[in-house]
C-alpha cells in the first residue's frame, strides 16, 4: 500500500461519519432501523483506520504523509497582504494512533447504545449526533493546520452541546448543555486570538511552516514574550475543551447526557482534544508557557481528585476523575514528559471509556439509579460488568500489569526528574498525592457499587447482566487496559514499540533564549536558534532514566495505601467514614460542595452579569430614555414654535403680499374704464410728465 492510498483512506475515514449523520438525520423518521446504517458506517471507519494505523506505524514509521490543496487566496488583505489559505490532512504517528482510538471507541459506543438507548423517542437522531461528533473529532486529529483544527474544534463543541442536552425536556440537561457551550467559548476565544497572532505573523496556518519560521528566529512582534503569550492563548482552548482549572466546572454537569455519550465525549475524545492540541503545538511552547501549563495541570489534577472523594453519583465520580487525569497529562507536558503524556492519553481513553460504559451497565441494571449509596452487592448480579470495571479501576489506580501503571509511572518519573533537575518538587508531590487519592476514590466507588450487601433490595432483585451488545464493548476496552498491547515489559514501557518506535520526542522550534528546565539551552548544550533539535537536554534524559525506579516504587506504595485505605473504610469498616467526615467537617464540606466553584461563578460572573444587566436597564430607563424623552419634548416645543412662526410670520408675510397686490390692483383698476378718450388722455398726460422730467435733466 503506497502513501497516496493511505491519504485517500484517511479522507474516507474522515467523511464516512458525516455521511452517516446526513443519511440518519434525513431518513430517521421514515426508516426506524436507519441507525444500523450509521453503525455499519462506524464499523467500516474503524476497519479502515486500523489498516491505516498498521500500515503507517510499520511501513512509514518515520515519514509524515501530507495532502493539501489551496482553498482560497486572500488578495490585498490588511496586515497579511496576499495569502493563500491551504487545507489538508497529515498522517504522522500521533494522528494515526488518535484516529484509531477515536474510531474504535466511537464504534463501541455506537454498539453499546443499541441496547442502552432502546425505546428512546429520538433513537435515530441520537445516532446521527454521534456521527457528526465523530466526524468533527476525526477532523481535529487529521488536520495539518490550525485553522482547520479550529473549525473542527467548534464543530466538536456544537455536537457535544447537542449530545449533552439530548434529553432537553429535563431542565438540568438543557442547562448542562448551555453551560458546556458557554464555558468552552471562553477558552475558544483565547485560542482564536492566539491563532490570529500566528497568522498575522507567519501568513500561514500550517503547523510545519509555523514551526519552521519560529526556528528561523521569526517571532510574533519580534519578541519571545509574545511567543509565550501566543502559546498560552492557544492553550486556553485546551483549558476549556479538556475541562482544566478554572474552566473545569462544565464537565461534571455534562453527565446529564446519555451515559454512552459520557464515554465517548468526556473520557476518550472531546476532552482529550485539548491534550492533543498541546501535543500538536508543543514545539512552539516556550519555557514560561510550559511552566504555566504545568501549574494549570497540577491544579486540575489535584482539585477534582479531592472533589471525587465525596461524590455519590457514579458518573460524577468518574467525571471528576477524568478532569484529574487530564490534569495529569497537561502537567506531564509542562514538565517535559511528552511521550508519557500522550501514552496516558491513549491508555486513559480505553480504561475510562470502559468505566463510563460500565457505569452505564450498572445504571441500566438498576433502572437508572446513579447514587452509589443505593447500590451494593452487584458483583453477584453483574459479574462481567464487575470484572471489566475492576480491571479498568486497577489500570487508573496504577496497579502493575495494567496500561495505566506504565503510563502513570512515566508521568510520575517525569515530575521526579523535573524536581531533580530544577529543585522544584511541587509537581512530583502533586503527582504522587493525586495517585493516592485516585486509588482511594476509585476503589471506594467499586466497593460501594459492587461489594457488600444490597442497599436497595427491590432494585437489586430486578438487576441483571447487560445484553451482549453492551457487554462486548466492556470486554474489548478492559482487555486494552492490559500492558502487553503497548510493551512486552510489564514494568517499563520505554523499550516497547509504543514509545521507542511510534511516539518520539518532538523537535524544538523555540529560540534558545526561551528554553530552560528540561529543554536544551545555551547554558547546558548550546544549539543554534535556527536549527531543529530534539527537545530534551541530556541531563533531563538522564534524570528521567534515574527517576524510573524510585518513581515506580513510590507510585506502588501510594496506590497500595489508597486501595488499602478504601477497603479499611468501606469494605472492612475499621474506620468510620461518617465519623471521619465529622472530624474534618470544613474540609469535607469543601470537597462535597466542589470547592464552591459553581457558587463563586454564579455570584461573580452570573450574578455580576445580572447586576450589570440591571444597571444597563436603569441606565436605559433613566439616562437613555431621559435623553430620548428630553429630545422628544424639545422637538415638540420646537415644532410648536415652528407652527406659530409659520402661522404668524410666514403666513402673515404671504398674506400681506397678497393684500398689497390686491390693494395695488384695486388702485389701478380705477384707470381701466374701457373708454379710448380716457386712455388717450393718460397717454398725453404721461408724455407731458416725461418731457418735463427730461427737460429737468
What do the PLM-derived regions correspond to, one by one?
Residues 108-149, 158-469, 486:
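Hydrophobic transmembrane alpha-helices and their helix-loop junctions in integral membrane proteins
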Residues 80-84, 491-557, 568-697:
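Aromatic-capped, Gly/Pro-kinked transmembrane alpha-helices
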Residues 13-28, 107, 239, 243:
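N-terminal signal-anchor/start-transfer transmembrane helix
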Residues 1-9, 26-128, 202-222, 249, ...:
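Transmembrane helix-loop-helix hairpins at membrane boundaries of multipass inner-membrane proteins
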Residues 241, 398-403, 408, 484-495, ...:
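Juxtamembrane "helix exit" motif at the C-terminal ends of alpha-helical transmembrane segments
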Amino acid at each position: 500500500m503506497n502513501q497516496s492510498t493511505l491519504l485517500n483512506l484517511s479522507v474516507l475515514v474522515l467523511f464516512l461519519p458525516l455521511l452517516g449523520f446526513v443519511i440518519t438525520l434525513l431518513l430517521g423518521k421514515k426508516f426506524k432501523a436507519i441507525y444500523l446504517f450509521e453503525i455499519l458506517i462506524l464499523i467500516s471507519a474503524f476497519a479502515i483506520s486500523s489498516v491505516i494505523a498498521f500500515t503507517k506505524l510499520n511501513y512509514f514509521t518515520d515519514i509524515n504523509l501530507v495532502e493539501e490543496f489551496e482553498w482560497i487566496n486572500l488578495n490585498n488583505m490588511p496586515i497579511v497582504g496576499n495569502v493563500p489559505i491551504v487545507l489538508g490532512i497529515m498522517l504522522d504517528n500521533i494522528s494515526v494512533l488518535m484516529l484509531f482510538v477515536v474510531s474504535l471507541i466511537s464504534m463501541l459506543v455506537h454498539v453499546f447504545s443499541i441496547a442502552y438507548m432502546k425505546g428512546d423517542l429520538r433513537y435515530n437522531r441520537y445516532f446521527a449526533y454521534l456521527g457528526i461528533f465523530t466526524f468533527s473529532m476525526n477532523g481535529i486529529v487529521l488536520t495539518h493546520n490550525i485553522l482547520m483544527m479550529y473549525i473542527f474544534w467548534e464543530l466538536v463543541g456544537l455536537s457535544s452541546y447537542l449530545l449533552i442536552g439530548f434529553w432537553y425536556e429535563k431542565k438540568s440537561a438543557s442547562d448542562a448543555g448551555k453551560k458546556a457551550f458557554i464555558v468552552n467559548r471562553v477558552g475558544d476565544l483565547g485560542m482564536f486570538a492566539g491563532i490570529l497572532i500566528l497568522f498575522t505573523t507567519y501568513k500561514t496556518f500550517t503547523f510545519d511552516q509555523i514551526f519552521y519560521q519560529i526556528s528561523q528566529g521569526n517571532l510574533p512582534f519580534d519578541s519571545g514574550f509574545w511567543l509565550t503569550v501566543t502559546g498560552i492563548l492557544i492553550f486556553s482552548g485546551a483549558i476549556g475543551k479538556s475541562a482544566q482549572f478554572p474552566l473545569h466546572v462544565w464537565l461534571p454537569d455534562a453527565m446529564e447526557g446519555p451515559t454512552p455519550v459520557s464515554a465517548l465525549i468526556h473520557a476518550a475524545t472531546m476532552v482529550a482534544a485539548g491534550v492533543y492540541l498541546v501535543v500538536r503545538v508543543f514545539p512552539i511552547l516556550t519555557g514560561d508557557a510550559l511552566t504555566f501549563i504545568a501549574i494549570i495541570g497540577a491544579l486540575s489534577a489535584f482539585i477534582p481528585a479531592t472533589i471525587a472523594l465525596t461524590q455519590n453519583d457514579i458518573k460524577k465520580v468518574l467525571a471528576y476523575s477524568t478532569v484529574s487525569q487530564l490534569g495529569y497529562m497537561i502537567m506531564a507536558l509542562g514538565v517535559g514528559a511528552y511521550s508519557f503524556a500522550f501514552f496516558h492519553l491513549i491508555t486513559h481513553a480505553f480504561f475510562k471509556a470502559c468505566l463510563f460504559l460500565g457505569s452505564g451497565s450498572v445504571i441500566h441494571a438498576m433502572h437508572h439509579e446513579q447514587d452509589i449509596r443505593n447500590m451494593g452487592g452487584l458483583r453477584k448480579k453483574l459479574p462481567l460488568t464487575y470484572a471489566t470495571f475492576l480491571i479498568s479501576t486497577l489500570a487508573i489506580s496504577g496497579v502493575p500489569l495494567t496500561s495505566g501503571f506504565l503510563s502513570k509511572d512515566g508521568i510520575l518519573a517525569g515530575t521526579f526528574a523535573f524536581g531533580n533537575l530544577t529543585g522544584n518538587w511541587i509537581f512530583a508531590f502533586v503527582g504522587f498525592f493525586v495517585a493516592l487519592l485516585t486509588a482511594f476514590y476509585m476503589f471506594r466507588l467499586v466497593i460501594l457499587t459492587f461489594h457488600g450487601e444490597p442497599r436497595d433490595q427491590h432494585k437489586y432483585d430486578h438487576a441483571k447482566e447487560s445484553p451482549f451488545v453492551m457487554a462486548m464493548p466492556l470486554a474489548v476496552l478492559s482487555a486494552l487496559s492490559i500492558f502487553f498491547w503497548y510493551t512486552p515489559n510489564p514494568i517499563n514501557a520505554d523499550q516497547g514499540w509504543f514509545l521507542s518506535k511510534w511516539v518520539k520526542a518532538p523537535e524544538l522550534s523555540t529560540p534558545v533564549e526561551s528554553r530552560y528546565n528540561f529543554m536544551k539551552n545555551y547554558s547546558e548544550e548550546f544549539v543554534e536558534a535556527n536549527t531543529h533539535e530534539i527537545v530534551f537536554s541530556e541531563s533531563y534524559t538522564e534524570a528521567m532514566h534515574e527517576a524510573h525506579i524510585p518513581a515506580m516504587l513510590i507510585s506502588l506504595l501510594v496506590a497500595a495505601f489508597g486501595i488499602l485505605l478504601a477497603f479499611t473504610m468501606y469494605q472492612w469498616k475499621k474506620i468510620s467514614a461518617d465519623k471521619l467526615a465529622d472530624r474534618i467537617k470544613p474540609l469535607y464540606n469543601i470537597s462535597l460542595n466542589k470547592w464552591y466553584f459553581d457558587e463563586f461563578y454564579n455570584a461573580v460572573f452570573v450574578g455580576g452579569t445580572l447586576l450589570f444587566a440591571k444597571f444597563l436597564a436603569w441606565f436605559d430607563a433613566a439616562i437613555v430614555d431621559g435623553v430620548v424623552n428630553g429630545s422628544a419634548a424639545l422637538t415638540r416645543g420646537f415644532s410648536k414654535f415652528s407652527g406659530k412662526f409659520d402661522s404668524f410670520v410666514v403666513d402673515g408675510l404671504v398674506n400681506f403680499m397678497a393684500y398689497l397686490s390686491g390693494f395695488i390692483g384695486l388702485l389701478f383698476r380705477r384707470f381701466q374704464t374701457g373708454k379710448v378718450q380716457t386712455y388717450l388722455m393718460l397717454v398725453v398726460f404721461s408724455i407731458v410728465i416725461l418731457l418735463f422730467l427730461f427737460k429737468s435733466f
